[in-house]
Amino acid sequence: MEEEYGDRIRLHWRAFPLIPDEKPGRLATEKTQEGRRRVAAEEPRARFAPPAVGSGLPASSMPALVAAKCAERQSDAAFRRLHDSLFLAQFGDNLDIAQPELLWRLARESGLDMARFEQDYAAGDAYQVALTDYAEGTAWFGVSAVPAVIFNEKVSLVGAVPVERYRAILDWILAGEPGGLVPIPPDEAAAGATLPDAK
């Protein structure tokens, strides 16, 4: 979408920990597999590889979110490189992104200033920044799952939805929000689908 819309849109990533507390021993289930298969079918460019049933899952999402916040302090580009690496590691390669060794390797491979990254990570305040993102998302916008996208602090899409919904909302916003009603792509309107009302 960023490539398609260029500088007409600006994307700002916020942290939303799916597993804020440590939960060791998490294992992939058939539901995990099916969820990843569904997302992969929706967006073929995304690398979603279903994990084997019974394989390990990250014990917490916080270490990776903290690492991403530390990268963001270096630059938006540094954040995007690490974010993309973390995403691919977890969803494409089924690696445990809660493991410090993997986080450090991905940070190095993403070209981060490692001295600064290690200092920021050890300082601990990036953890609080990630929790603040989470609190704001739930309190202000009712976010309860990912992916969640908030458009102009008015409309939210939560969960894996077809890319056409994103386009419809972006086009509506860029056109000045005509009619005050959030649009529904024609094929979904015929099926009776609805989008959340503008807030």
Q: What is each residue range found by the language model?
A:
Residues 1-5, 9, 85-199:
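C-terminal cap of thioredoxin/glutaredoxin-like
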Residues 1-91, 99:
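Structural alpha/beta surface segment adjacent to cysteine/selenocysteine redox centers
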